[in-house]
Amino acid sequence: MNMQLGSPVSVHPIPIYQGNYVWVMRHTSQNSVVVVDPGSASEVIEYITQHELTIASIIITHSHWDHVTGIAELCANLQLWRDEEPVVYGPSVIQDVTHPVEDGDRIELCKGVDVPSLQVIATPGHMPEHLSYLLPLTTPKLFCGDTLFSCGCGRILQGTHEQLRTSLDAISALPSQTEVYCTHEYTLTNIKFARTVEPQSQALIDYEQRVRSLRKNDLPSIPTTIEREKALNPFLRYKELSIQQAVENHLRLKGLTAADVFKHLRLWKDSF
């Protein structure tokens, strides 16, 4: 369990598929949890049952199957729910969402305890409807689905490069100590690309060694932090001269704008 010292909220990863995480948030004084992006139900049911917990609510970032497939089965098992009534927050385009939310909305995380509400942030780009959720504690926690990964970001599928760049700029502006909970264990693959862009980065070399050690012991590399990503992630560093020069050298072009650099960096990663 990833427990921030003194934090009233713990966050636990449930691995599913090949490198996905379902995140489970729990107030330390309660036995009900918030489940983030249940792409599969069986592992969540096993965890809930084993730890004698109940589900308070589910929150969803976007509509892809590996984030939503478990919703229906979890909702059908009413005995799993604290109030025997499924509560699913997320984009309105998702069929199983019972409580549609959008940018600027707030979600009560825990009843009867003094914890800030989750803040809903629109983060389109990977998908147009993509939402992220910020828990503004002393050490904030961001659940960002497939928008930001450690040393990487989501592919452009039905969104646009401009949308994704704007979303990542907004995430980058969050407090540096913010913990980032994405839903894929892509870190080593992303570091490989980041080192291609900045081959002289000792910080990337050191981080790769750290992540390899974690993965060797079957431990997640997530959460990361905004501070780390601003130092290492090329998609948050696209305005840096070293990134601009790398992209221009890759394209054999000069004079790219920051928006051009970001777009071509993402296209470079797409074919990497």
Swiss-Prot record:
Cofactor(s) it depends on: Zn(2+)
S-S bonds: none
CDD domains found in the cross-reference section: hydroxyacylglutathione_hydrolase_MBL-fold
Alphabetical keyword list: Hydrolase, Metal-binding, Zinc
Cofactor, how bound (note): Binds 2 Zn(2+) ions per subunit.
Gene Ontology MF annotations: hydroxyacylglutathione hydrolase activity; metal ion binding
EC top class named in words: hydrolase
A Pfam family assignment: Lactamase_B
Documented EC number(s): 3.1.2.6
Binding site for Zn(2+) 2: 66-67, 146, 184
Binding-site list for Zn(2+) 1: 62, 64, 126, 146
GO biological process terms held by the UniProt record: methylglyoxal catabolic process to D-lactate via S-lactoyl-glutathione
Pathway involvement of the protein, from the record: Secondary metabolite metabolism; methylglyoxal degradation; (R)-lactate from methylglyoxal: step 2/2
Transmembrane segments: none
Reactions mediated catalytically: an S-(2-hydroxyacyl)glutathione + H2O = a 2-hydroxy carboxylate + glutathione + H(+)
Annotated family: Belongs to the metallo-beta-lactamase superfamily. Glyoxalase II family.
Quaternary structure annotation from Swiss-Prot or TrEMBL: Monomer.
Role description: Thiolesterase that catalyzes the hydrolysis of S-D-lactoyl-glutathione to form glutathione and D-lactic acid.
UniProt name for this protein: Hydroxyacylglutathione hydrolase
Native organism: Saccharophagus degradans (strain 2-40 / ATCC 43961 / DSM 17024)
